Every structure is written in C-alpha cells, then in structure tokens.
C-alpha cells in the first residue's frame, strides 16, 4: 500500500471519528450509568504506593464490578489491578460501602473485605499484582477488619452465620411471619430486598429514620483473632486488643458525629493516639482533638475554616501532629483541603477545587483523601468532570493527575457546567450547576429541566442518578441542579416552600437572560428532591412535566408506617406537623397529593423502588382515572436508590424520553419505543381536550420551536 493511500485511509478514519464525536453532543445515559467510581484510598507504609478500589456498573451483565488497584505515588507507572471479581457491599438505602484496605507493615499486601460467591470474607492481594487469596473462611459474613501493628494477626467481627440467618428466615416463613413494629409493611414480608448479595428478610432498626437491616442484624457481634502464619483463630480476649489499637472503634466521644453513608468523623493519630472529631451543635460544627478520648478535655481548631465550612473528611498526617481536613463552601460551590497543626494552632489552605475533594459524588460524606507525609492522594470530581485521582503536595499545593479512568466520558463531555448563584424574594442565597442546551440558535429559548437536592461531585443524574443532566442538555434541554438549602428548623413544609421560591427565582433569572422558555420547565428528583418537585407541582403553575423517584406522604404511608410506634409518630409531627389524618386533617390537606388531586394536572412520571411504591397508591390510582397524564413503573427488590444497572439505565432513558416528549414534542423514531409513544400521545390528546373543555390553554407555548434540539 502506498504512503498516499495509507494517509487517505488514516484521514478517513480521523474524519469518521470526528464526525462521531460531533454527533455525540454529550454522554449518553448508558455512559453515565457506567461511570467508573474510585474510593477507599490507602497509602502504603513506605509511602511509595496508593491502593484504591474501582467500581463500575455493567448494563450488559446487570452487575457491578469492583477491583483493587495499586499505583506508585510518583505516577511512574499506571495502576496495577491486584484483585478483581469482587461485588460491592451495600449499606442503608443501597449506598455502596467504602473502606480503605489495611496495608501490611512491609507494604507487600493489602487486606480488604470482599463479597465473592455470596460470602463476605477477608481477602488479601499482593501489591505487585502477582496473586490474591482468601484469608478468612468464616461461616458468617465479616463486618469489619483490623490488622495488628506487627502485621502478624488479623482481627475481624462477625454476626450470626449465613446458615443461621437463612434458616431463621425460612422457619419464620414456614410458620407465618408475625407482624411486629420492626417488620416493614407495604412490601413483601419474605426476602423482599438484597442484603449482602442475596434476597433476604429485612427489619427496621433503631439506628435512623426508616433504616432497615437483615433479620438478625441486631444480634451480638463476635470479634475473632486470626494468626496469619498458622491460620489458627480464637475469640478475642482483652489482652489481644492493644495489638489492634490503631484500627479498633473509638469509644468515649459521644459528641462526635457519623455522617449517613460515610466514614466515621473520628480518626485516631498513629503518633500518640490522639483523636480528631467533629462536634456538631444546632447550627454549627467544630473540629476538635482529644489527647485522651476518655476525658472531656478538647483542643478546638481556632480557624474560621474549621467552623464556617461544612466539614467533609478528616485524616492525620503520618508521624506529625497535623490533621488534614476537607471543608465545603456552599456559597461558592468549592471544597478546600486544609492542614491544621495542633501544636501551633495554625491552619493552612492547601488547595481548593470547584467540586468534590475526596470522592466522586456527594453521597459519601466522610470519604477522605489518603494522606502521606508530604502529600495526599484524592479522588477529584466536579459537575462535568468525572472521578479521577490527583496528588496534592502539602508544601506547594501543586496538583498532578495520577489516574484518569473515565476517558470516554471526558471525550464526550458535552455542554460545560456553569456555577450559578441567585437569591429569591426573601434574600435567600441559592446555588446550582447549569448545563446550557446544545444546538440552540441565537435568540432561541430552550426548555429547562430542574433537579433540586444535592449537586456535589460528578453530576451523572442528580441524587439517585436517574435524570441524565448532560444527556438532556445535549438533546437541547437546559439542565439545572439546584443545591438544596439547609433544612428549615421550623419543619419540612418550610423547606418545601423554600424550594418553590428558589426554583421560581431560578426560572425567572434564566428567562430574563433569554436562555430558557419559562412555559417549558420540567422537574424531577429522589427523596427530598421528589417531595420538592411534587410540592412545586401542587403549589404553582411553573412546571410542564414532572418525574419523581420517591412517593411523598399519604394516608397509606401513615397507616403502614405508624406501627413502628411513638418514635415514627413523633418525628412525623415534628418535621411535617402531621398526626393521623383524623387528628390533623388540615395539615394533611395542605401537604399530601392524595388530598390535592385537582392540583396535579401536570404530566407526571413515577419510577419507584418496590419497597416504597405502595405510598403512592392514594394518588396514582385517582390520577390514572383522571385526564392528567401519569405512568408508574416499579423496580423489583429496589430499596430507596435504584441499584441494578439495568434499572438505572431504564429510569434514565425513560426520563430523557419523557422530558423530550413533553418539553420538545419530540418522538424517538426507534421502533422499539413505538408503543410507549402511542400511549403518551393518547394521554396527551386526552389531557389537551380536557384542558380545552375546562377553558384552559391546553398546550404549552411552542413558539420557540422545540428549544433547539438537534434532530437525528
């Protein structure tokens, strides 16, 4: 082949690649679902390597793959995969548990919990990637691990055996499951959800609001000590514990706080055993150090950064009297890394990031950077930049990219996010991440989608990852993630009103700039974000389409959950002002969509977890018999978040279709979706006819021509 012909072939390939990249205005929902997450960082004792875990969903396999990697801190070599075939262990609401591995003192091995073959055991992997092997073979799932200071012994905790749990579940089922306050009603009573990789019974715990765990999770735990050389085990004795002092739970600091879904906000120094912790008051947080955790004498961090910012993580510098911590400034959307020297009291700003330092998303509060003597390794991410590893030099603040796993997402980034601030009529400050619509013409106003809740980290789909913000923007629908303001102390209704005010002010701001069409605004969310969207839907005419992932409060919800007793009822009264429907009828009429069917006239898509959807019966059924367009999808065995990759993709794809249909009049020509659009067109025709008959404007303004959506 001549050189000229080779050049022509290469040019053709380059043009095809360029065309493909141009056609892909933004990441697809599938690409967002399959984002690679990084977590659980730990630096080796010799300070030369960092170990971390990489998690990724696979839609094809409908599973998550977790692998452990080790990489030199100097970046001289790419990371080496030292262990794979691991399934993520999940916690409350379906969140993935993160925990740094334990390095052996000689820096040759990492020890970690792994779920393999339906069992959670301790495994270890050689740092050079030569082998990975199972360490424990316990009949029960391992819940926590500790490595002795000399690396010769392993300590781990377990509850009842897997066989005991499964036998107890089956025995209860065989004789009939007695309904007690800790049995969740409204879902299957026998093995409704996934616990440690299998369908299992669940019960309410007394640890938090609506928190569930496995059937025998409240049984006493046992601590086992394993001799790594001989394999011999015994129940831990008091004289064994000093060898594991660095990794054992910290007792005696009742003022400390553990954030939901994250690591403990109590960390022990390897230098002298001092403990850094966060003391939370009614409206402030303070970083403190206890030289002796058994006494009430504390050293408070004197700098404003220790009090004004939202503290996200803590770590000690090796062999130094310094605490490295991360603080978030909501008004600027930035997080900063600081060094507090306890002896001198000085606090130094190391670096600042327009996103998250120490994690790829905002769910995992407390996931810290891995700290070496002179530098830290952190997972960095921002609204439009997916998770990656960077090193940060403590002396200079200089940062260097260590590992970029999400190259495909980087190549298909699409519209860049813009950080916005605005105030409502009450002067309250709001912040958000705005993705401008792609493909618009000058002077053309785009439709707008709004998600209201948490906007930390890489925004693949808002909290819950179900609304593909970048994909919507790439399709011509501007997207705005609004960071929810702190909960109003007077209760949830005040917080909903704040959300309504902030959403309205944001729409007015973007409309005044000629960027969006205020008559074509959609909104969606999970949990509080879902409640906010339904409140805006009921209390305003701002929205043209809605999609929610969590039901809100209804009489059915109250009836099924009130069996939990006084604690549930007290919290409902405190936060929402709700007693039973007969005790507080006016509050229910104001709050619940079940009593506001006439105000639910906006097309609404419901995509709920099976464990929660029952609460929507009170308003889904009446809506189904009305002219309001509504569809309800239920994802089997899901808790609060959608866990299965195929469920995540289905929710994302359907949300994209839903908002393109109602905000752009767009119908995907994919023949496999023909039946979906036939239903939606039928619902739309009925809805428009009913609105015309009622003397309303039955169609949203389309004078701006579909918001500049690129047409295939």
Model region roles, listed by residue range:
Residues 221-222, 349-441, 466-470, 474-475, ...:
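Non-catalytic accessory segments flanking enzyme active sites
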Residues 24-37, 71-97, 125-143, 226-263, ...:
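Multi-bladed beta-propeller domains
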Residues 8-20:
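Bacterial N-terminal signal peptides
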Residues 403-519, 526:
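Cap/lid segment of the alpha/beta-hydrolase catalytic domain
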Residues 61-68, 118-123, 163-170, 220-224, ...:
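Structural motif
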Residues 65-69, 159-238, 399-405, 462-468:
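Predominantly five- to eight-bladed beta-propeller fold
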Residues 51-58, 99-105, 110-117, 155-161, ...:
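Beta-strand C-termini and the immediately following turn/loop, strongest in propeller blades
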Residues 468, 474, 482-712:
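Active-site-proximal cap/loop segments of hydrolase catalytic domains
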């Amino acid at each position: 082949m001549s050189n000229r012909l080779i050049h022509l072939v290469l040019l053709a390939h380059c043009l095809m690649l360029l065309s493909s990249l141009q056609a892909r205005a933004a990441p697809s929902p599938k690409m967002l679902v399959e984002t690679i997450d990084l977590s659980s960082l730990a630096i080796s004792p010799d300070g030369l390597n960092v170990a971390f875990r990489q998690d990724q969903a696979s839609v094809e396999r409908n599973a998550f793959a977790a692998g452990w990697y080790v990489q030199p801190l100097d970046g001289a070599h790419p990371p080496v995969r030292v262990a794979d075939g691991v399934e993520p262990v999940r916690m409350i609401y379906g969140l993935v548990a993160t925990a740094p591995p334990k390095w052996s003192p000689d820096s040759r091995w990492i020890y970690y919990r792994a779920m393999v073959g339906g069992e959670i055991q301790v495994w270890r992997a050689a740092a050079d990637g030569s082998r990975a092997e199972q360490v424990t073979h316990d009949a029960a799932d391992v819940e926590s691990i500790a490595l002795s200071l000399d690396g010769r012994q392993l300590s781990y905790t377990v509850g009842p055996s897997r066989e005991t749990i499964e036998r107890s579940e089956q025995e209860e089922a065989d004789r009939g499951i007695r309904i007690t306050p800790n049995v969740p009603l409204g879902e299957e009573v026998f093995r409704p959800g996934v616990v440690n990789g299998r369908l299992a019974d669940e019960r309410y715990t007394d640890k938090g609001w609506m928190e569930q765990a496995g059937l025998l999770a409240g049984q006493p735990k046992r601590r086992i000590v394993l001799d790594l050389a001989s394999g011999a085990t015994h129940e831990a004795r008091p004289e064994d514990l000093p060898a594991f002092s660095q990794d054992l739970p910290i007792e005696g600091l009742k003022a400390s706080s553990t954030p939901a879904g994250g690591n403990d906000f109590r960390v022990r120094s390897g230098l002298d055993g001092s403990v850094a912790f966060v003391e939370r008051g009614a409206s402030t947080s303070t970083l403190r150090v206890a030289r002796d955790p058994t006494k009430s004498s504390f050293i408070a961090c004197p700098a404003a950064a220790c009090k004004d910012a939202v503290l996200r993580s803590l770590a000690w510098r090796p062999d130094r009297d310094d605490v490295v911590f991360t603080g978030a400034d909501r008004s600027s959307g930035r997080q900063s890394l600081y060094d507090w020297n306890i002896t001198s009291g000085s606090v130094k700003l190391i670096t600042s990031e327009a996103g998250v330092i120490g994690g790829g998303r905002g769910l995992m509060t407390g996931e810290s950077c891995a700290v070496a003597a002179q530098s830290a390794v952190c997972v960095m991410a921002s609204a439009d930049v997916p998770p990656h590893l960077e090193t940060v030099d403590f002396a200079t603040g200089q940062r260097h990219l260590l590992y970029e796993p999400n190259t495909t997402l980087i190549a298909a980034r699409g519209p860049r996010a813009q950080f916005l601030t605005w105030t409502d009529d009450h002067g309250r400050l709001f912040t958000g991440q705005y993705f401008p619509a792609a493909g618009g013409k000058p002077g053309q106003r785009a439709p707008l989608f709004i998600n209201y809740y948490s906007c930390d980290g890489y925004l693949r789909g808002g909290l819950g990852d179900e609304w593909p913000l970048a994909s919507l923007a790439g399709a011509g629908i501007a997207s705005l993630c609004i960071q929810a303001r702190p909960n109003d102390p007077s209760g949830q209704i005040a917080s909903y009103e704040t959300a309504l005010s902030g959403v309205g002010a944001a729409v007015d701001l973007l409309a005044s700039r000629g960027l969006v069409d205020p008559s074509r605004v959609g909104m969606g969310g999970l949990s509080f974000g879902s409640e906010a969207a339904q409140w805006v839907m009921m209390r305003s005419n701002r929205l043209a389409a809605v999609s929610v992932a969590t039901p809100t409060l209804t009489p059915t919800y109250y009836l099924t959950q009130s069996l939990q007793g006084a604690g549930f009822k007290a919290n409902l009264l405190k936060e929402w002002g709700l007693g039973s429907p007969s005790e507080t009828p006016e509050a229910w009429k104001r709050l619940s969509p079940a009593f506001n069917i006439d105000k639910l006239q906006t097309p609404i898509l419901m995509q709920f977890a099976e464990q929660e959807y029952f609460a929507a019966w009170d308003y889904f059924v009446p809506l189904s018999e009305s002219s309001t367009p509504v569809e309800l999808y239920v994802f089997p065995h899901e808790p609060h978040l959608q866990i299965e990759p195929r469920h995540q993709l289905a929710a994302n794809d359907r949300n994209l279709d839903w908002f393109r249909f109602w905000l752009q009049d767009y119908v995907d020509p994919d023949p496999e979706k023909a039946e979906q659009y036939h239903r939606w067109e039928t619902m739309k025709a009925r809805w428009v006819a009913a609105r015309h008959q009622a003397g309303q404007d039955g169609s949203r303004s389309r004078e701006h021509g579909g918001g500049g959506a690129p047409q295939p």
